[in-house]
Amino acid sequence: MINFVAPINDIDMTQPKASQKITVVTVCYNAVKEIEKTIQSVISQTYDNVEYIIVDGGSTDGTLDIIRKYSSRITRWVSEPDKGIFDAMNKSARMATGEYINFMNAGDLFFDEKVLSDIFAGRSYDEDVLYGSTILHYKGGYKPHRSATIDRMPVCMPFCHQSSFTKVSVLREHPFDTTFLSIADCVFFRQLYNSGGTFRDVKKYIAIYDMYGYVSNTSLKCYFESCLVHRQNPTLGGYLRRLVDINFRPLRYCSLRFMYAE
């Protein structure tokens, strides 16, 4: 296990602090090809009240060398085995000292260097979740994806977690369910909405989301996890199934048979 906390004199304390402290987290594992651009995107933010945490799952491919290269700009980083991305995200929430937390994982980027300043400088929020729009990065190019109004939550996911900021206190009280490998974020936001959690669309593009990696590595798991949830909770599972149904229409028939099998 490696656990690094930056000395106080290695963190820029010269600028006056803005109103709300934001924690940005990057979770990674063997991400040597993606991690540097994500780190650069985070440390280039002009907002001055940010802590940056990296939680690595015990990489062996050179990822740690890149993290060490930027260690003076990282508030804290740890490298140790974990039980998956959502276990690592829960771990980072326990480390966080900010009021809101954003997960910008390896391969994903902020829309530009002024995202945090545009949202938080000179402003203060009380909502449980702030969210915005996303640029989807496919292998062949980019596609804007506007956030939806929160009343669409019963039928679709209005935003992705890279384009959201969640109160740290809320995530500590209701951590991601690590029994899900791919859809714990969707389950978290849906359950928060159902329990009366408050959301605010900040009407800005926040993240550039690496969809190529998602589609190739995650969507199939997401689809079948959603089907399993549907068997246990038809309302929640049906909602999650619709999130990925459009991408896997050929699987629809067999998945419906699985969900409704006696």
Q: For each of these PLM feature ranges, what is it?
A:
Residues 91, 258-259:
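Short, surface-exposed amphipathic charged segments that create phosphate/polyanion-binding patches used
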Residues 205, 217-242:
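Catalytic core of nucleotide-sugar-dependent glycosyltransferases
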Residues 233-257:
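A transmembrane-helix-recognition feature enriched in membrane-embedded lipid enzymes
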